[in-house]
């Protein structure tokens, strides 16, 4: 997954899910309709991605399956029931929001630490070793 996708989940997905889970009955009706559409889009998109990852034998297939089985249906359920949604669904949504935040922050940290930066001492060490080998070559001629 890319850094952009992690950042999207941290700064867009988490706040949206937390907002709906926390404010429940104070959320405008159009937000519930949006959750229904979003849930359906998530299910369809992740079914498509799951097929691709299945063919590639990707170890990340589980992410798509979680979205198909858990995230999408939960959003559709809350969206369709709007103000009549039971309390447990909002609590599960809150858990999903914090799980998404935690997982994506963790993955972002892992990916950022894997990025390799060029340090000045690495550049100078390479230059010093290459100039030393050139000097040895010229001295023996």
Regions found by a protein language model. Name each.
Residues 9, 62-79, 96-99:
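Hydrophobic alpha-helical membrane segments
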Residues 22-26, 57, 75-93:
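Membrane-helix boundary connector in multi-pass membrane proteins
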Residues 32-42, 90-100:
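Hydrophobic core segments of alpha-helical transmembrane domains in multi-pass membrane proteins
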Residues 41-55, 76:
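Canonical alpha-helical transmembrane segments
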Residues 52-66:
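Loop-to-transmembrane helix junctions at the membrane interface
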Residues 81, 100-115:
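Membrane-water interface at the C-terminal end of transmembrane alpha helices
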Residues 116-134:
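Short, highly charged, low-complexity non-transmembrane loops/tails of multi-pass membrane proteins
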